[in-house]
Amino acid sequence: MNKLRDKFVDSTVEEERLRENRNHEKYWYRWGPYLSERSWATVREDYSLNGDAWSNFPFEHANARVFRWGEDGLFGVSDNKQLVCMNVALWNGKDERLKERLFGLTGPQGNHGEDVKELYFYLDNTPTHSYMKALYKYPFKKAFPYKELVQKNGERGYEDKEFEVYDIDGLYRDSETGDNPYFDVFFEMAKDDENPSELNFRLTIHNRSKIDSGELYIAPQLFFRNTWAFDGTRTKDKPLLERDAEAANLINMTHKKYGNCQMVFQPSPGGFSSGTNEEEEDKEVEDIDPLLLFTDNESNLVKLFNEEKNPSEYTKDAFEEYLVQGKTDAVNPENKGTKACAVYHFKNIPPGEYVTVRYKFTNDPKNSIFKAQNLAVVDEDEFDLIFDNREEEADNFYWRITPLPISDELRNLQRQAFSGLLWTKQFYNFTYDAWYNGDANVKPRPPPNRANGRNKNWKHLYIEDILSMPDKWEYPFFASWDTAFHCIPLAMIDPEFAKRQLDLLTREWYMHPNGQIPAYEWNFNDVNPPVHAWAVYRVFKIERNMYNREDRTFLERVFQKLLLNFTWWVNRKDTEGKNVFEGGFLGLDNIGVFNRSEPLPTGGTLEQADSTGWMAFFSLQMLNIALELAKENPVYEDIASKFFEHFILISDSMSFEYATDITGEKCKEVIKQNLWNEADKFYYDAISWGDHKVQLPIRSLVGLIPLYASMTLEPSIIKQFRGFKKRVDWFVNNRPEIFDRNIASMSKKGVGERLLLSLVTKERLTAILSRLLDETEFLSPYGIRSLSKYHEKHPFEMNVNGVEYMVKYLPGESDSGMFGGNSNWRGPIWFPTSFLIMEALQRFYLYYGSDFKVECPVGSGDYLNLAEVAEELGYRMIHLFVPDENGERAIHYGDHSKFLSSDPYFRDYVPFFEYFDGDTGRGLGASHQCGWTALVAKWISDVGISCVRLPRTPRSSVATTASTESSEQGPKMKRMARRKSAKSLVNYTATILDLTEEEKRHHRIGGTHSGLTPQSSISSDKARHLMEEMNEEEGIHETVVPEDRHNFETKLIGKLKDKVKNMKVTDKAKDEDIDPMDPMSPLNKDVS
């Protein structure tokens, strides 16, 4: 029974860490990849008068100037308040500077805005950061081309492709020899089995070329974020690093919060000599002992600003001065300070060889660090075993997240998407008062009304949290609508962290007192789409379905704050009180003909189809949550009725507008079309001058967003909430003209007797889909274009006061500097908006069923129901990343980057771009947008099992990160590989939308059954394992595929009870009412 009990109640080691963290038993979140990848040229570090953040703190200052608000670094790790920091520095003996942070162009330097110019990849990470792995590619044959990258990109215009590092011949690839003259620098961190504050680090550096590398300096760093210069504690309680008196490779750390800790740098085994004869080639080089260097994390004001004196004799740039400039007096000879490093000097790494560097940070050195012969040492076998164990535990964890027979390529893609999502966590620190007024101990004081008064209405902001970033180099700041999408894949692997992100943005030190959610640091006042309520409810449902937990406290707490946010929208963005909204920016940058964040050059007001569609969507999400909360608290039933009414009024106003008579009263007899264009069968924005308006006939995402606002009302919900039903019936009976005009099927029952709330009728839905699924309009081979390809030959043009405005289809980069020029919504494919369209189609399918089919693609003669259409769109977007029949990934489209798909040292590493070319799928924008582009991980779980053009049976249960070699390792590989999945589209749809079991039963069509769904819940997975185990003991050898969860659980409980009858139970267990299915019951402790 113990064996069976363990099978049922067991969890992966990583899940157990998450449980310990959730229950405050151990703080596994304490240490993680929380350093930014760019703190220079950010708004927070800008103390200029004119608000020019790009120039006020340039890259050239970063090595010698202290950051006020947060540190950055290569492979950066810190505690959750970023008091103690670690990163890696490299020098190839040729570069003009130490490589301790990633380089890129500022907004003005790039021909398409800011752009990181390095090659690096996130390969692995777990939610507790018990194991992390990343790769940086560092050239050694040539010096890193800092100046050339700036110059070449500066010579290019908006119409040109960007100049990339791999465009430089001989840097990463030699065109003549095919050689790869660079180092692969693999970084790994593994936490101790029991101690969350014992961190083990391992660097493995490969020479990928056919030539000797020459020298390489590796310098792992340990330092404190400089807080003492700003809070008046320059001498009081100042932390200290100093070399140990007995061990030359050991650093002792003293810190007010963390006490006494140590960091030991193990001698490296070295490489091999590249001698000229056989005997010399086989001769092993002696170990490389690290050299410890110390300085202070203080600005070099003398060097940067010609000041007379520095705050400290030893400054932040000391290690670069020492190694690159040869200034041996730059470091502290007393071997102490607030910044330290360990220098490993390798004179050469021969072709194809590698070297390894190991080091450890711990708050409990007595159990893991030993001193011998003037050195501190660690057990290297035990050290490497920790990494083996953590990596195996990560494999087990991710196999449990997606235990499906999907291809190795998809498993690798999903693993890297999750890893990137976790790597892009960052400590975000911002206090408005200190930022705007300056620090008391820092001179000169900031100029009055500096930065043009940026964010002056956000004086309440006080942020010091670990947040999910869109991209830690290009966007090292939170963006509220990005965060909502990040939380969907995050909830699959760490629902607690996902909930924390959504909760934080509504807390009083983030949300404005008027209810507005801050947008992003360049302008917290900008208006992002209202997707927060949707994300909150989706995360709630994902946790319920995957982990069998319902956090109603979270749902209710955030819902209360979202009531404020909804009120802010209604009061501030519906200026004429007509339920038609002029939202402004709404995250879609340049999608309109005018800058939507600024007043119209035409005068009047821009009534936005997407803004009004977003508000209808917001209303339905709030209705969803209110009905969920009303299941246990009837107070919320009244609130649900209120949001139902909001949706009804918004939906009516979006398509129709009453005229008014001379007194200003509505003339019920006269109705004008509003944002829907009956001739074009599409939604358009309109400019309103009060008494008349003009539509702007641009076919863009703006006209597709109304599809988002859809929701099915289940018969059980209508029956359960009588007050809500009464309100619905009143509208149906007393306002029939609204429903007859544009509320889809409120008086007609769909499949399963359910009702549909939607902005679009069946006729309008069909019309919109005829454009959406047309490959000459929105449908790309790789997803959904943001602007119809129709506008390639038919641009929209408008002349206002002699100025020409035009919107033309641009599948690639932007052709202007609008919004920085680094994004484009006039043709490319974007993940967040596509994700919501696909979910909307799934919801429509639940109402209309399999009989409602549309041609997909238009002109193909193939007719699909809406669930199949959603799957087809998912397949297309997944195939942005996976190799085609020629082994090439669409994201690497173009001759200059094809080698990224074919080179054995590149082809398995997947960059997650911000957006994608609408025609070719080429990756564009930020190259590590592992925020919303990580949504691909959810699609893989949803539809990966049936994804075409890929092998469906995995060769391994291990999600490889560097190879697709076959492997026999992994948990229950045979059992997992032989599992079957249900074929019913209802099951796919119910799983994708994270419906409850009750809702799934309501949605079954034609007697279909639930079966094994693509996104198996972890709790259901355990139950099936247990049933299979017991079947095998009884001689039954078959895969368990439960036809009905209730019947399945009944059978399982029966089998367990039969087992219990044959076992000896202690008296204590006999005297209590024991549920054998309860893992916490006394039975599970007392049965022998």
UniProtKB/Swiss-Prot annotation:
GO terms for molecular function: Glc3Man9GlcNAc2 oligosaccharide glucosidase activity. Residues 956-968 have a biased composition (Low complexity). The keyword Phosphoprotein applies. GO terms for biological process: oligosaccharide metabolic process. Gene3D superfamilies: 1.50.10.10. The modification Phosphoserine is found at residues 299, 984, 1081. Residues 954-980, 1063-1088 are annotated as: Disordered. The modification Phosphothreonine is found at residue 1013. Keywords: Phosphoprotein. One of its GO terms (cellular component) is cytoplasm. It holds the Pfam family MGH1-like_GH. This is Uncharacterized protein YMR196W. It comes from Saccharomyces cerevisiae (strain ATCC 204508 / S288c).
